[in-house]
Amino acid sequence: MEENYGHKPVLLHECLGALAIKPDGIYVDGTLGRAGHSLEIVRRLTTGRLIALDRDETAIEAANRRLGDYLDKVTLVHSNFSALDAVLHELGVHGVDGMLSARGVSSPQLDEAQRGFSYKQDAPLDMRMDESAALTAREVVNTYSYEELRRILFEYGEERYAPAIAKRICQHREQKPIETTLELADIIRSAMPASALREKQHPAKRSFQAIRIAVNDELGELPPMLDAAEKNLEPGGRLAVITFHSLEDRIVKKKLQELAQGCICPPEFPVCVCGRKPKVKLITRKPIVSGEEELAENPRARSAKLRVAEKC
């Protein structure tokens, strides 16, 4: 019986179709998680190879067990996808046939209370995807200025009550440091009007998302990750990116559109003089989303969006 890895790979069949896997190809899973996508990729390889990255060492350990029957075809690396250039150089790989990245926090990270990602379970304020990293949610909450907290909550969480929440956090930490997830969730709740507390989603959801993004620099690493992916794909190679909130999807959409743009000469020019050529072709003009069957089995897939591009 297969171990329960607590993670259902989102948009699995859509990703496999998008990658158009060749049995002898080289593929990269840049956000390994619990290896749900990686397992199905490597099952389709004969002489091919899978390079799987994750900044969470716990994910690497779990994947090492889950992919045990295929480890002769798999290389597991503790690293960020944005460091892909260095990883491939170290491995002596000069081009790959497909890449996958599923952004955001994984289900096991959410479900493991001690990681500090969940507003429903009490734990120290941590939220680090890479537990060897220095910055924690505790430091963000207790040391960042009011203005910086307000900006993070508003920009990364799209939280309309960001000013009130940031102010309440600053008031509480003047009395004593904020140490735990439930303590922070209660502070957030206390800053919100009664009308907001009647909404379907948890009042701390957007704020926790924002702080997590800040701790892990999730938005900052997206553009270099996409540049590294484009640079290392072979012509005809595919890049598939899954995002879980609108901020990331907008960044991915904009970056892929930039990479797909050709001539930028003014329209009145009779011939192109800029010499710019598209680096990728957009396979999906609109993102692919989960169907009703998947949503019934995995409600966390509701916000997932898949975008696909092909190297020119």
Show which residues each predicted segment covers.
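S-adenosyl-L-methionine-dependent methyltransferase catalytic core, i.e., the SAM/SAH-binding region
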Residues: 1-312
